[in-house]
């Protein structure tokens, strides 16, 4: 159950990686 949720969240983060990169730092 936890593995499936992590994979779906990684796919969504990959799409907003540009905006998340500036918020990460």
Curated annotation (Swiss-Prot):
GO BP: any one term: translation
Keyword Ribonucleoprotein set for record: yes
GO MF annotation list: structural constituent of ribosome
Pfam families documented for this protein: Ribosomal_L41
Residue ranges that the Swiss-Prot or TrEMBL entry lists as coiled coil: none
GO CC aspect terms: ribonucleoprotein complex; ribosome
Region entry Disordered, spans: 1-25
Keywords from the UniProt entry: Ribonucleoprotein, Ribosomal protein
Superkingdom of the source species: Eukaryota
Subunit and partners: Component of the small ribosomal subunit.
Name assigned to this protein: Small ribosomal subunit protein eS32
Organism: Glycine max (Soybean)
Gene expressing this chain: RPL41
């Amino acid at each position: 159950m936890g593995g499936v949720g992590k994979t779906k969240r990684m796919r969504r983060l990959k799409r907003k990686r540009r905006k998340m990169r500036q918020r990460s730092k």
